[in-house]
Amino acid sequence: MENFLLSLCFGALGAVFGSFAVAQVWRLRAKQLQDEKTSGEKIDATEWKKLRSLVSVSPKNDRSHCLNCGYQLKWYDLIPVISWLSLGGKCRKCHSKIGATEFLTEVSMFALFVIIFLVFSPLSSAGFSLFGLSRLLILFVAFIPLTIMFIYDAKWSLLPTKVIWIFNFLAFIYWIIAFANTTNGFNLFSVFNIAISMTLFPLVYFVLAKISKEEWVGGGDWILAIGLIFLLPNQPIFAMLLLFLSNFVGLIFALFQSILQFKKIKRGIRIPFGPAMILATLILLIFQQFLLVFTSFIM
């Protein structure tokens, strides 16, 4: 019963984090459009008209508002999931559609946080684990930049560099905490393992990005891969699994894209690879205990 109530609380936290992440996505996009406009690049005038209000005020005075009519949202308009459902996905004032991104993100983050809590619960038969709670909280916070990157790359095929490095820092802290709780702590073997893992995934993608001039792999993908490796168990086999699963998920994305657009998959098709890498990491993260047992059995 205690785990159930806590999972609901963390699920609600996930919905809040999801709502915050989507808000940052629109702010980052508005800033990008402003920078491109200032540098003389051609931008989408309709999109800029919709988002420019997000960069026209100082961060201190920035308040959540409708991007269509400017209505400043009240606290009861900002309750994740519930507000969207009660308003039918529309602005309270002008009734323009808010869009499904906000709702889907909040629901997905609610479900994800519940699952992650159940997998990494700091509560066990042995009692409460402060280490487990610390690791869990860092992981939850790391999901904010991950969510931002997932949405941003899916919409505009671009990974914001600053957000990547924020995530990488959080992932590194998560890795440090994980090792601080192990019996052996830091040793040459653990350093060797992480070095091999970095060679198997991030370094391979770095080389591919440089050789292809970022045609095969984006410049942000290999940087993101560094942080994703830190989230997984410190075994090179997980880097190999992540490399395989990321490409497999990317292929699935390409198939769905071709089906939705009624087009055949062509050689050289470009798909946002960040979401594929993130989704692959989540799958490995959730099933890591099973995979650890399985790999120890076959190796």
Predicted features and spans:
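A membrane-topology feature that recognizes alpha-helical transmembrane segments
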Residues: 1-299
